[in-house]
Each structure stands twice: as structure tokens, then as C-alpha cells.
Regions:
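Residue-level signal for well-ordered alpha-helical segments
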Residues: 66, 70, 117-120
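Catalytic cores of nucleophile-dependent amide-cleaving enzymes
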Residues: 40-41, 49-66, 74
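Structured catalytic-domain cores with a bias toward divalent-metal coordination
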Residues: 2-10, 21, 50, 62-69
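Long, charged alpha-helical interface segments
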Residues: 7-22, 26-28, 32, 36-44, ...
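A short acidic, often aromatic-flanked loop/helix-cap motif at beta-alpha or helix-coil junctions
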Residues: 1, 53-55, 76, 159-160
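Phosphate/ribose-phosphate-bearing ligand recognition and processing surfaces
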Residues: 72-82
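Short, structured patches in soluble enzyme cores that scaffold and shape functional sites
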Residues: 25-29, 47-50, 69-73
């Protein structure tokens, strides 16, 4: 189908290609997590990663409501880069929220242990090696770069919309 020959690499979606267009994107585990959150009655669902970390944190603090951070992983398995991002969020919101969860504590510790050199640490994880085999090292480095995409996708009325 014309126009549907794209993957999930950030480099495949330059601004001039996506600006002012409607995109339909599905992922293996991210889509599953979205459906699970909807099934469980989530009030608000936002999509976060290091490139929009500050927008995620700002939104969560504005809402001042209980939060569940869902790490979608890869092939239904634990994924370090997702947990690192959760740890980064927790680091930024922990003074505004009570956190009583071992997995959150662990994510925050992992992030704090590696936050000063994420590029070096990320090169040790399994996903780096999978993507490196396809020449996608720059994708991983982009995905751990903070605040390079100052937008906030929010799921509302059956669609992800951008809260810039």
C-alpha cells in the first residue's frame, strides 16, 4: 500500500514528512499496553520517552493524580530502556508524589546509577545489539536524548492527539 512502507525508526519520520498529517502507527507491545490501559479504565493515557521527558513530567505534576507508568517492553519481556525512562520520570516527580512500589524504586535506582552516561550504558543492553545488527545505533541514541521532541501524545476519544 503506498505510504505504508515505514517502520518504527524515528529517522523514517522527519518533520517535513509528518507535519500536518494524520499518522497511524502500531507497535508490538506499545499497542498492547494501550489496549490494556483502556480495558482497565485508565482516565488519561499519555505516551512518553526520553525525547519528551519534560512534557511528561509537567503533565503528571499538573494532573496531581495517581499515576501508573507502564513499560511496554519488547516481545512481552522486560526491556531496560523502558525501565530507564520510568526511572527518569520517577526522579523528576518523586518529590510531588508518594511512591511505594519496589519496581518504581528499582527503576529510579537504575536510572540514577546511569543517568550521567546513558549513551555508554545503553550500548550494553540487549536491544542495542539487536538494533545495531540493522545499523540503527543512532535510533537508540536518539531515543535516550532528553527533550528533543517537546510534544505530548495523549489518547483521547479513540486517537492519540498531540499536546504541544
Amino acid at each position: 500500500i503506498p505510504g505504508l512502507a515505514y517502520g518504527n525508526s524515528p529517522s523514517e519520520y522527519p518533520r517535513d514528512f509528518i507535519e500536518n498529517k494524520i499518522l497511524v502507527i502500531t507497535t508490538t507491545n506499545g499497542t498492547k499496553l494501550l489496549h490494556l490501559a483502556l480495558k482497565q479504565g485508565a482516565k488519561d493515557i499519555i505516551t512518553g520517552s526520553f525525547p519528551n521527558l519534560s512534557k511528561v513530567v509537567e503533565y503528571l505534576k499538573e494532573q496531581n493524580a495517581p499515576v501508573i507508568l507502564g513499560c511496554s517492553g519488547w516481545k512481552n519481556r522486560f526491556n531496560i530502556e523502558d525501565v530507564l525512562f520510568a526511572g527518569a520520570v520517577i526522579e523528576e516527580i518523586k518529590d510531588a508524589f508518594e511512591i511505594h512500589c519496589d519496581s518504581s524504586f528499582m527503576a529510579n535506582q537504575l536510572y540514577n546509577q546511569h543517568k550521567n552516561d546513558l549513551p555508554t550504558y545503553i550500548k550494553t543492553v540487549t536491544h542495542w545489539h539487536r538494533l545495531a545488527a540493522y545499523g540503527l545505533e543512532e535510533d537508540m541514541l536518539y531515543c535516550i536524548s532528553k527533550d528533543t521532541a517537546p510534544s505530548l501524545p495523549i489518547f483521547k476519544d479513540g486517537a492519540l492527539i498531540n499536546k504541544a
